[in-house]
Regions:
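Catalytic core of pol beta-like nucleotidyltransferases
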Residues: 1-25, 33-39, 48-100
Length: 100
């Protein structure tokens, strides 16, 4: 995930937290997925399955980065434009039983 500007340890931590809360899928999208991010760009994640609230809290509190996270629940209703952006530019970070 080097082209995203996210340190490998942060990706590992996100995957560990996803496993902990039975998340099925984590998708990176936005500027970090497209590769046009700035140094302080936030990390946009879309999450499917599992305990979304606990996942979101732990990612914000327990990852080794000072970057801000915007985390969206794919199991809830979200704007069509946002859902399309996730489909178009999203990069799979974690899938249950398969991590990257």
């Amino acid at each position: 995930m080097r082209e995203t500007g996210i340190k490998p340890i942060v990706i590992e931590e996100i995957c560990d937290i996803a496993r902990k809360y039975n998340v099925q899928k984590v998708i990176l999208f936005g500027s970090r997925a497209r590769g046009d991010f700035k140094t302080k760009s936030d990390i946009d994640l879309a999450v499917q399955g599992g305990d979304f609230i606990r996942f979101m809290l732990d990612v914000n509190e327990e990852t080794s980065t000072l970057l801000k996270f915007d985390i969206f629940n794919l199991d809830e209703e979200i704007q069509n434009e946002l859902r399309e952006a996730i489909k178009k530019e999203g990069k799979l970070v974690y899938k249950a039983n398969v991590s990257f």
